[in-house]
Amino acid sequence: MNDIEFYVYHVVTRKKMKIGQIIHFDKNQTNTLYRFFFEREQLNSSGDDGIKIINNHYKNEELHIKNENAKVVMSYIDQTIRTVRKTIVEMVRLQEFPEYPSRLSCLYAAKSYEDALKWKALFDSYNREVLQIVKLRVIGNCFEGDGNLLPKEDGIPFSQKIEQAREYWKGNVSNELPELLINGKIEVVEIIDDFSAIHI
């Protein structure tokens, strides 16, 4: 797939961006989504992870976990099922749709300012702090997907999750709020809204 030039909008949530800032997403660059799910550890105050806690508390075919250990185990389970989902989606992309940007090595964007405002409203509803909405010039690739088609965070067989991932990578057909995955050379060309002063 050849790189193309296009403009999109990005809802900034972690660190403010500046006009002229350049971001490169290629096959070796991971995004914060990757780091959040694949590099984060869930440990109790003794340094035990979720699996060790489960093994230490499973006796006589019963499992009793409470307090800090229960929180660590539940966080570990939540992170693990979401990481499995992301791994399946990436596996299907690599095998069947390698021309599309990876969800683990991309920036998430919106096609229009109006869509960016919809994403901001969604983030606000989850109390996720939005710092800015910026306009980006991209020389790279994009994929428009429907997040509702991603594999669910449930216990269905992996074979069904693979089918769900396939449906996602077929592209957005009729979603009210598409997610745009972009990669390549990305430049901030305009700060449209700066909400950071509101959060002081």
Which residues does each PLM region occupy?
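Conserved NAD+-utilizing ADP-ribose enzyme module
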Residues: 2-6, 12-80, 103-105, 114-127, ...
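Active-site-proximal specificity loops/subdomain of glycosyltransferases
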Residues: 72-96
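A short acidic-Thr-Gly-centered motif at the start of a beta-strand
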Residues: 97-101
